[in-house]
UniProtKB/Swiss-Prot annotation:
It catalyses: L-glutamate 5-semialdehyde + phosphate + NADP(+) = L-glutamyl 5-phosphate + NADPH + H(+). Its EC number is 1.2.1.41. It is found in: Cytoplasm. Its main location: cytoplasm. NCBIfam families: PRK00197.1, proA. It is an enzyme of class 1 (oxidoreductase). Coiled coil: none annotated. This is Gamma-glutamyl phosphate reductase. GO terms for molecular function: glutamate-5-semialdehyde dehydrogenase activity; NADP binding.
Length: 427
């Protein structure tokens, strides 16, 4: 938990120095060639694989610190690294290297009647601050994405993932040096003092351009409340699935179980299942059975309890709860209109899915539901930058300014205008 703390002059001095170094590194990064950036990224991936044993050893120490604590299983799962996850981390960095470089891309171009030729061109944001808790893989993902987009990044991990993040960060610095890029392009805050978070939120004397929080609701809420710089964030997942009467029941069963149970502790996990009232007799019971058979606790609305009286009744609080666990709330709704109304009332605007074969139902869902990610006949667990072909993501944003949905390399850029003339003067 990252609570508000008093100002610390020593921490402020340390953090402002980190900010100055990041800002200095951001300039050469902003015009570094694609070849050089990709060389650094591939060297980072090589270093992570070469140092896998050390990374896992440091992660084991972090995990040992959670023993005897009251950490949720989902928290420990996010903290845990293994051979597969380390390999995926390296693969993710290589995937980012393989992406098109957004910097310098001409987004739009047009000619004016007076002969001026105008181009809108992607540019780096500058310095990005990433504050995260139990996900050591964020060190690699955020560092690589920011580098690809020509940005410097300041990473502040939680004390729970400190050792793992330090081991991964050392590999990133090794990659920067191998490509001749400034080592301060990717910095990891060396202290766990919570005052460091406050300093980042104040912008480090103008060094930080954007803050991205990755963590629990309390962290994100604090960042959104206190930050004096723009924030890319979502407060919670709270994803919904609506199963329409037109849905293929076998498909719906597979999708619902995957959306809830594949990984229960991620923000793309489904937390509420809505079933069309017209399909109670055909769809509700099979969906409940497949969920309970998978080990999921179901919290049921009164209408659902009439069909399955042995389930736990849902409270009003359940409809606005992100469980991050093997628990799901289930309600029967009055068709697509009822589903949209429920989602509009309780959604966090993160991700929602509709399972339906009726194109009119799908069209209404896509038009009227105002969440960052909408899926048709697919699991909510696809709400991920890697699955979107972005290589990875630095986070998922649910706001409507600048970035929305998975924040990948393109979303980590701004733009400028280039105007070519031939001696024009304004009358």
């Amino acid at each position: 938990m990252l609570d508000t703390v008093a100002l610390s002059p020593e921490i402020d001095a340390l953090m402002n120095d980190i900010g100055r170094k990041a800002k200095a590194a951001a300039r050469p990064l902003s015009f570094a060639s694609t070849e050089v950036k990709n060389r650094a990224l591939n060297a980072m991936a090589d270093a992570i694989l070469a140092n896998k044993a050390e990374i896992l050893a440091e992660n084991a120490k972090d995990l040992k610190d959670t023993e005897g604590s009251e950490m949720l299983a989902s928290f420990v799962d996010r903290l845990t690294l293994n051979d597969k996850r380390v390999a995926e981390m390296a693969e993710g960095i290589r995937a980012i290297a393989a992406l098109a470089d957004p910097v310098g891309e001409v987004i739009a171009a047009w000619d004016r009647p007076n002969g001026l030729k105008i181009e809108r061109v992607r540019t780096p944001l500058g310095v990005i601050g990433v504050i995260f808790e139990s996900r050591p893989n964020v060190t690699a993902d955020a560092g690589a994405l920011c580098l690809k987009a020509g940005n410097a990044v300041i990473l502040r991990c939680g004390s729970d993932s400190r050792r793992s993040s330090q081991a991964i960060h050392a590999c990133l610095v090794e990659g920067l040096k191998a490509a001749g890029l400034p080592e301060h392009a990717i910095q990891l805050v060396p202290v766990t003092d919570r005052a460091a978070v406050g300093a980042m939120l104040r912008g480090l004397d103008g060094a930080v351009d954007v803050i991205v929080p990755r963590g629990g609701k309390s962290l994100v809420a604090r960042v959104q409340s206190e930050a004096r710089v723009p924030v890319f964030a979502h407060l919670e997942g709270l994803c919904h699935i609506y199963v329409d009467g037109s849905a293929d029941i076998e498909m719906a069963m597979q999708i619902v179980v995957n959306a809830k149970m594949r990984r229960t502790g991620i923000c793309g996990a489904a937390e509420t299942l809505l079933v069309d009232g017209a399909a109670i007799g055909t769809h509700l019971t099979p969906l409940l059975e497949v969920l309970t058979s998978a080990g999921c606790e179901v919290r049921a609305s009164p209408t659902v309890l009439k069909v399955a009286p042995g389930l736990k009744p849902a409270t009003e609080e359940d409809w606005s709860t992100e469980y991050l666990d093997a628990i799901i709330s289930v309600a029967v709704v009055d068709g697509i209109s009822g589903a949209i109304a429920h989602i509009q009332k309780y959604s966090s605007n993160h991700t929602e899915a509709v399972i339906a074969e009726d194109p009119d139902v799908v069209a209404r869902f896509f038009t009227e539901v105002d969440s960052a990610i909408l899926l048709h006949n697919a699991s909510t667990q696809f709400a991920d930058g890697g699955e979107f072909g972005m290589g990875a993501e630095i986070g998922i944003a649910t706001g409507k300014m600048h970035a929305r949905g998975p924040v990948g390399v393109e979303q980590l850029t701004s733009f400028k205008y280039r105007v070519h003339g031939a001696g024009q003067t304004r009358p």
